[in-house]
């Protein structure tokens, strides 16, 4: 889940763990879909990391015999990564403020995300 933009503002942040993420965005289990965010370059890029467990609640019904992470949740994980990048690098950002996508163009899912996968 790499988020990219065009300009660079300030210094990079190497990694934010789950506790630091929770201080920045309001999402909580079961909808908090990133475990950490790495390589945050302000206004430019960030990499969200999610270790997908067999215990994820959405696997119960999607699909019981062939569990696959729903694409809409992958997009949500990308949005959460972007929110963390904005929150962590914007001066005077109010923690817990919601950040929204306005458009997503040409999104493609190259392969199913299954239990045991780690997505970036």
How does the language model describe each region?
Residues 1-2:
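Iron-sulfur (Fe-S) cluster-binding modules
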Residues 6, 10-15, 82-120:
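Hydrophobic beta-strand-centered segment that forms part of the acyl-chain substrate-binding groove
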Residues 16-28, 95-96:
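Short aromatic-glycine motifs in intrinsically disordered, low-complexity regions
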Residues 28-69:
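Catalytic strand-loop segment that frames the active site of acyl-thioester-processing enzymes
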Residues 37, 69-93:
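Active-site helix/loop of acyl-thioester processing domains in fatty-acid/polyketide metabolism
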């Amino acid at each position: 889940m790499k988020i990219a933009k065009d300009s660079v503002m300030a210094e990079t942040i190497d990694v934010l763990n789950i506790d630091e993420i929770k201080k920045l965005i309001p999402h909580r289990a079961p909808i908090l879909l990133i475990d950490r965010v790495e390589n945050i370059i302000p206004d430019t890029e960030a990499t969200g990391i999610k270790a997908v467990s067999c215990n994820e609640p959405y696997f119960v019904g999607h699909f019981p015999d062939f569990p696959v992470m729903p694409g809409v949740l992958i997009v949500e994980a990308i949005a959460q990564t972007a929110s963390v990048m904005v929150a962590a690098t914007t001066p005077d950002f109010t923690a817990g403020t919601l950040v929204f996508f306005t458009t997503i163009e040409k999104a493609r899912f190259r392969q199913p995300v299954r239990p045991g996968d780690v997505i970036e």
